[in-house]
Amino acid sequence: MNNLFFSRFCGLLLLCSIGVAAFAQKGYKRAYTLFNAEGKEIGYDELIEALAQPDVVFIGEIHNCCITHWLEYEITRSLYAIHKEKLMLGAEMLEADNQLILDEYMSRAISYDRFEAEARLWDNYSTDYAPFVFFAKENKIPFIATNVPRRYANV
C-alpha cells in the first residue's frame, strides 16, 4: 500500500514538475526585465555581480511600485550575502530627523509599535518597506534615513 502511494505521489510530482516547466517556457510573464549599461538584457546574477563591485550603489524606484520594492529587498539580501558586515543601507522613505528613532528601533531599544507611532512612515511602509528594514535589523546592517525632513521638503 505504501509503495503504491509513493509511486502515485512521485508520478503526480513528476507531472506537476513538467507542467511548471512548460508554463515557465511558454506562457510565463516576467514582472521585470534587467538591462546593463549598453541596453543588453541581463540576468539577476549578472546584475548582482555588477552591483557587488562599486563602493556605492544607488537604486531608483517608483514609490508605489511593489515590484521595485521587492527587487530592492532581493538585491539587499544578495549583496548582504557577499559583503556581510561591510554593507550599509540608506533609504529615502525615512527622513533624516527620524534617524534617532530608527537607530533605537534597529538596536531594539524601542518596539515596532513605538517606532511606527513616532516615525513619520509612508502609507505603504508596512507592505513595501518594512521587510527591507526588518532584514537590516535582523542582520545588524546600519541603516541611514536619507530623506530631507518633511518640514523642509514642503517649503
Q: Model segments located where?
A:
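Hydrophobic h-region of N-terminal signal peptides that target proteins for export
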Residues: 15-23
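N- or domain-start disorder-to-order transition segments that initiate the globular core
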Residues: 23-54
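A substrate-binding/cap region within the structured catalytic cores of diverse enzymes
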Residues: 100-155
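Bacterial N-terminal signal peptides that target proteins for export
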Residues: 1-11
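Solvent-exposed loop/turn segments at secondary-structure junctions
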Residues: 62-66, 94-98, 149-153
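Short internal beta-strands
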Residues: 87-95
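An N-terminal structural lobe/cap that precedes and organizes the functional/catalytic core
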Residues: 47-84
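Solvent-exposed, acidic/flexible segments
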Residues: 40, 44, 65-72, 99, ...
